[in-house]
């Protein structure tokens, strides 16, 4: 049985929930992977594969608790007890208001809080339905959420600054490069333990409803968290530590990534058989490529390494340009057309060209060179990038290489946490609509169906794959100088903060948390000009506008529908 007379409301809610989740992926994916991509720890397509997997699993495995908060704690559902269909309409209006604003903000490249958006939409629609008293303003509802918007960025910034400062003084700015590398290899082992413990904590702590872990005792929960971190750290020291020690410290340039599985043998293998490195060979990529040439920088690398690195960069850049040109000649005409003009020309050529057009549209997002766009696409938000980079230190690429491995892990952890936390912004209202449509009752604390979480997770992944680049361009190197060591500190801080918020049932803004971490790491240079405050102001202006605009859209739509004239109703003159 179901309220089939309101099938159209359920259908509309499904559509706008998908649009909302799509824009969550397109807008908020920058929080998870902007640092990894901007620091060159991950290629864009690698980040998108990792994002797709971790965001979806986070949404399905651990997303229910926060979804319940969005659905139950913002609006006082008791006022809808006798009219559950009105709550169904109210939640749909909230989705419409949120998704419309997110679509506009994402299109103009404004990183906004998707949490602000759905909370604003829910508040606006709730006021239109039941007045101001229909909203839970107390600490158990809106007040707690609003407080978290201020507390979370400060907390993330403090954690990021502490983590990066530890890396600076124990690894990055140690005078001896050999000692710096040794310290980095040991520190990473500790950080692997911390990172995997945090991820396990997200799934197990207080019991994830969808995994039925609520009955675990405190002792069992603590043991599972510590044991997972310990196993991950042991695996690191067995396989990864000897591999990276031989590759980076002993400079064995012949090693490939697959040689990690030979890690234990490197503990006993002599370094005498390592062949001399060919002249001009790069042991690692230059993680600062494209940003060194903007101005004179404060560097801890010696001049010989810098010269060799720059020489290798020029060769690599030529190869990259040739590869890009080869790809373009296969899919683009000789005449210089904009992307949209070329797509339009393919559309007009008929159905034979449509498969190619479909592929170009789908792959457009993950084929973007976002680092080039961050550095070279100048606009009023870019500010003085040259001056900002001049005030930042460029650390040795071999040390950064070690951090790049760890950054991929923290990015995955943060992505999992992001999927768990932010999918609620779309699935919470949709779950309420579905339960009412199916049962014609409100239900005090109904469980969010797994299919709703999966539906939101799929939309979120599609959004980050196809349109996430538009937001990533505005973060990363446009806000501070990014590198693996900096990005790792940011991502670990954001993951910790998001994990805490998710398990406490507080839907925080991962956008604000991420920016808080980015700004704090930038300020570790002890220079205010090492942060692009224009971009920070752009982010904050988006957060300031989001809640009222989303609320206004949702409130107007819900108010018009609820108070619209109807057949068979007699209206009195007043």
Swiss-Prot record:
| Membrane topology value | Multi-pass membrane protein
Which residues face the membrane's Cytoplasmic side?
27-43, 106-117, 167-184, 244-354, 420-447, 525-541
Concerning PANTHER family, the annotation shows: PHOSPHATE TRANSPORTER (PTHR11101:SF80)
Its recorded reaction(s) are:
2 Na(+)(out) + phosphate(out) = 2 Na(+)(in) + phosphate(in)
One Pfam family name from the record?
A: PHO4
- Per the record, where are the segments of Basic and acidic residues compositional bias? 315-332
Instruction: Sum up the protein's function in the record's words.
Output: Sodium-phosphate symporter. Active in early growth phase.
Keywords of this entry: Cell membrane, Membrane, Phosphate transport, Symport, Transmembrane, Transmembrane helix, Transport
Chain ranges sitting on the Extracellular side read 1-5, 65-84, 139-145, 206-222, 376-398, 469-503, 563-574
Q: Which GO annotations describe the biological process of this protein? A: phosphate ion transmembrane transport; phosphate ion transport; transmembrane transport
Q: What is this protein called?
A: Phosphate permease PHO89
Region entry Disordered, spans: 301-332
Q: What does the record say about induction?
A: Transcribed under conditions of phosphate limitation.
Q: What family is this?
A: Belongs to the inorganic phosphate transporter (PiT) (TC 2.A.20) family.
**pH-dependence of activity, as noted:** Optimum pH is 9.5.
Under the GO molecular function aspect, what terms does this record hold? identical protein binding; sodium:phosphate symporter activity
Q: How does it assemble?
A: Forms homodimers and higher order homooligomers.
Q: Which organism is it from?
A: Saccharomyces cerevisiae (strain ATCC 204508 / S288c) (Baker's yeast)
Give the record's free-text account of how this protein's activity is regulated: Weakly stimulated by Li(+) and K(+). Inhibited by monensin. Inhibited by phosphonoacetic acid. Inhibited by methylphosphonate. Inhibited by dimethylphosphonate.
Q: Does the keyword Cell membrane apply?
A: yes
